[in-house]
Amino acid sequence: PSFVSIDVSFISLTKVLLPVRNLMEENGEIAALIKPQFEAGREKVGKKGVVRDPAVHKEVIEMVTAYAQSISFAPCHLEFSPIKGPEGNIEYLVHLVWLPDGVTEEETNVDVDAVVKSAHDTLDK
């Protein structure tokens, strides 16, 4: 496929991105839901599996996008989901593109801090 949508639970995206890439056409794209409750270590997940700390959100987004870059995906866009998870988790959508030749990191950077801040400013009301 040239496009894949990923929404997984109880497993890290870092465990599925490489197998998915191996099934894709070159220069394919992925839209993936980053769920902090399944990316953060158990010590960082609160009651009912909710991650409320913006610093943990930033940490897991950076971890997932760094891993994606390590397997030749460029994180081209990041946005928070306007819908919280069932227990109140804030989740994030990332658009990944199989890194084409000639694309620089500047062109693929996403502003994690701004997106996490906007998510909490909007949804923590």
PLM features: what roles do these ranges have?
Residues I90-K125:
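Flexible, glycine-/basic-rich loop-and-beta segments that form/coincide
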Residues K35, G88:
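Residue-level signal for inorganic ion chemistry
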Residues T14-A31:
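A short glycine-rich, Lys/Arg-flanked "PGG" loop and its adjoining helix->strand segment in the class I
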Residues I6:
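Redox-cofactor binding/interface segments in oxidoreductases and associated redox assembly factors
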Residues S72-P82:
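Conserved S-adenosyl-L-methionine
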Residues P36-D53:
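Short, glycine-/aromatic-enriched active-site segment of Class I SAM-dependent methyltransferases
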Residues P1-F3, K15:
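A short acidic, Gly/Pro-enriched loop at the edge of an enzyme's catalytic core
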Residues H57-I71:
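Short alpha-helix
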